[in-house]
């Protein structure tokens, strides 16, 4: 038989669920990345050009970083000689007498 009035249901239909469901991490959009680096040296390793590039692409944005460096040791050594010679005073600047 019937035992008294209605009992309160164990689950109220209007209540918010205790667990909120979110998309699993596997469904997140993928990001594509790439990077490269190169070094080009001259004959005798007197100068070099080095490049580095990194790219990150997502469905929402794209970022690229680049770095290019040029060095030339030959110019550095020629620009600052260890011993400098000066012209004799007679040839340095002509003097005019009136």
UniProtKB/Swiss-Prot annotation:
Disulfide bonds, paired cysteine numbers: none
Start-end of each Sequence repeat: 7-10, 15-18, 22-25, 79-82, 86-89, 92-95
Listed InterPro entries: Cuticle_C1
Keywords, alphabetical: Cuticle, Repeat
Gene Ontology MF terms in the entry: structural constituent of cuticle
PANTHER family: LARVAL/PUPAL CUTICLE PROTEIN H1C-LIKE PROTEIN-RELATED, PUPAL CUTICLE PROTEIN C1B-LIKE PROTEIN
Domain remarks in the Swiss-Prot or TrEMBL record: The tetrapeptide (A-A-P-[AV]) repeats found throughout the protein are also present in many proteins constituting the protective envelope of other species.
Function: Component of the cuticle of migratory locust which contains more than 100 different structural proteins.
Name of the protein: Cuticle protein 67, isoform A
Organism field: Locusta migratoria (Migratory locust)
């Amino acid at each position: 038989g019937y035992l008294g009035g209605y009992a309160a249901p164990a689950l109220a239909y209007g209540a918010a669920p205790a667990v909120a469901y979110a998309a699993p991490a596997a469904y997140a959009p993928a990001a594509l990345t790439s990077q490269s680096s190169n070094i080009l040296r001259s004959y005798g390793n007197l100068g070099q050009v080095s490049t580095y590039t990194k790219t990150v692409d997502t469905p929402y944005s794209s970022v690229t970083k680049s770095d290019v460096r040029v060095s030339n040791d030959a110019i550095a050594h020629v620009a600052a000689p260890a011993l400098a010679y000066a012209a004799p005073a007679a040839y340095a600047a002509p003097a005019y007498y009136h």
